[in-house]
């Protein structure tokens, strides 16, 4: 029992309180574990619904040799002169102007395209209106001609009936004169 308590105290010293609490609630190992196989490291990344993903890190040949020195510090940047700074500023200004000109050109092209689309839409609308008006006029003319033809046919029948009635009256008068 005493050895268990001393081992527990050693463990408490090694782990932070947060790790201890997490290990109590979550007993499985951390998902981002690193496995080493010879000259490469395999790091497990997030698990996805489509499967698992891994990151493979290969050690460089310089890391493999034991006598190789540690990575050297990066080379120090030399002080830039005022002329170099001026050149960089001018180049940046030129890039900014070029980018601004390109944006303005794209805006102009977009406006021109919008004008063309609007003009085409107006033209199509005018053509549609003109065709609809022509079609309506044609239908009105056709109905007017049909109406006039119908009225002419009615007048012709009425005239024929009047002629027939006049002939019947004449025949009747002739019969009356002959009979009486």
From Swiss-Prot:
Record-listed Phosphoserine modification sites: 50, 60, 65, 68, 72-73, 81
Biased composition (Low complexity): 60-74
Subcellular location: Golgi apparatus; Cell projection, Growth cone; Cell projection, Axon; Cytoplasm, Cytosol
PTM per Swiss-Prot/TrEMBL: N-terminal palmitoylation promotes specific anchoring to the cytosolic leaflet of Golgi membranes and subsequent vesicular trafficking along dendrites and axons. Neuronal Stathmins are substrates for palmitoyltransferases ZDHHC3, ZDHHC7 and ZDHHC15.
Principal subcellular localisation of the protein: Golgi
Residues annotated as domain SLD: 38-180
Chain spans, region Disordered: 58-82
PROSITE patterns in UniProt: STATHMIN_1, STATHMIN_2, STATHMIN_3
Molecular-function GO terms, alphabetical: tubulin binding
Entries under Gene3D superfamilies matching the protein: 6.10.280.30
Segments forming a coiled coil: 76-179
A biological process term (GO) from this entry: microtubule depolymerization
Cellular component per GO, a single term: cytosol
Keyword Transmembrane: no
Lipid-conjugated positions (S-palmitoyl cysteine): 22, 24
Keywords, alphabetical: Cell projection, Coiled coil, Cytoplasm, Golgi apparatus, Lipoprotein, Palmitate, Phosphoprotein
Family statement drawn from the similarity comment of this UniProt entry: Belongs to the stathmin family.
Role description: Exhibits microtubule-destabilizing activity, which is antagonized by STAT3.
Quaternary structure note: Interacts with STAT3. Interacts with CLU (secreted form); this interaction may act as an important modulator during neuronal differentiation.
Protein name as catalogued: Stathmin-3
Organism in which the protein naturally occurs: Bos taurus
Higher taxonomy: Eukaryota, Metazoa, Chordata, Craniata, Vertebrata
